[in-house]
From Swiss-Prot:
One of its GO terms (cellular component) is plasma membrane. Signal peptide: none annotated. This is Cytochrome c-type biogenesis protein CcmE. Residues 30-151 are periplasmic. Its main location: membrane. SUPFAM superfamilies: Heme chaperone CcmE. One of its GO terms (molecular function) is metal ion binding. InterPro entries: CcmE, CcmE-like_sf, NA-bd_OB-fold. It comes from Pseudomonas putida (strain GB-1). It holds the Pfam family CcmE. One of its GO terms (biological process) is cytochrome complex assembly. Residues 132-151 are annotated as: Disordered. Residues 1-8 are cytoplasmic. The chain crosses the membrane at residues 9-29.
Length: 151
């Protein structure tokens, strides 16, 4: 093999290795940023992975919101009218958060089956419902109406 071909071969191999490393980094970054949606039934059945960031959504059960008197800790229960899952959150809840409303919480499921949320999103008007929550409610046989849901 002459020196010109050897140089060209090393250049091509180097480029292929570089592209492979770049694709590997891109796939790794994308995989870490995927937050799959799980219903309370799926979480209660153990289908949601533990200690992996997920989105959990449903309707906030009436009478389930418990606020700590000395911190920003909040505990509430979310349901899809089949099963319910407790969610804990430390922070200020959105102004539109209330019992009987649809929410989506981003966080991790711990070993006790509790979603430890680091972000809570509430629907922003009486007609809007997160698509995942609406679909989950339809699958459970409940009407996905605005305002309060009736079990």
């Amino acid at each position: 093999m002459n020196p010109q071909r050897k140089k060209r071969l090393l250049l091509i191999v180097g480029l292929l290795v570089g592209v492979g490393v770049a694709v590997g980094f891109a796939l790794s970054a994308l995989q870490q940023n995927i937050n799959l949606f799980y219903t309370p039934t799926q979480i209660a059945n153990g289908e949601a992975p533990l200690d992996t960031r997920i989105r959990a959504g449903g309707m906030v059960e009436k009478g389930s919101v418990q606020r700590s008197s000395d911190s920003l800790d909040v505990r509430f229960v979310v349901t899809d009218f089949n099963k319910s899952v407790p969610i804990t959150y430390r922070g200020i809840l959105p102004d539109l958060f209330r019992e009987g409303q649809g929410i989506v919480a981003l966080g991790k499921v711990n070993a006790d089956g509790v979603v430890v949320a680091d972000e809570v999103l509430a629907k922003h008007d009486e007609k809007y419902m997160p698509p995942e929550v609406s679909k989950a409610l339809k699958e459970s046989g409940q009407a996905a109406t605005g305002g309060e849901a009736k079990p």
